[in-house]
């Protein structure tokens, strides 16, 4: 039950961010493009027997929630609620995907933090990726679940 609530909260945060981006930044000096991935469609609990179909259409496991495309570079953005708990291995997979396929990747827990990242990218001074820090934290912890609140407190 808490899993479903957290997922709904993360979806609400994503929706709020995308709508705010369109209203506040898109076409108003911001030259980048914010797009979404829907990796959750690959989970049978979400899409039932259609997960194989979504995979065949190009959906990839562990992709970040959003991507920001700017000046030919793609930045991965994975949204996490500050008070959420996640499977340690899944966070590691998400960090690996962002480190492998994206120019830079970011775990983000608020709209304000994302705006700071996007503003820095727009200025040509992108903030260092935090994916490897988060991955290293997860690798140092032997628990199966990690608290994102604890990650924020200890790393940032």
How should these model regions be labeled?
Residues 1-156:
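Catalytic phosphate/metal-binding cores of nucleic-acid and nucleotide-processing enzymes, i.e., regions
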């Amino acid at each position: 039950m808490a899993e479903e609530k957290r997922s709904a909260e993360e979806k609400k945060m994503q929706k709020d961010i995308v709508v705010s981006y369109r209203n506040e930044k898109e076409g108003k000096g911001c030259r980048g493009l914010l797009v979404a991935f829907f990796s959750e469609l690959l989970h049978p609990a979400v899409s039932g027997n259609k997960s194989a179909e979504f995979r065949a259409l190009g959906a990839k496991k562990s992709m970040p929630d959003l991507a920001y495309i700017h000046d030919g570079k793609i930045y991965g953005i994975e949204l996490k609620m500050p008070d959420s708990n996640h499977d340690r291995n899944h966070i590691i997979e998400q960090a690996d995907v962002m480190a492998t396929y994206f120019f830079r990747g970011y775990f983000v827990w608020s709209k304000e933090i994302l705006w700071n990242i996007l503003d820095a990218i727009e200025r040509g001074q992108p903030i260092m990726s935090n994916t490897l820090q988060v991955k290293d934290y997860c690798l140092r912890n032997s628990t199966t679940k990690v608290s994102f609140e604890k990650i924020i407190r200890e790393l940032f």
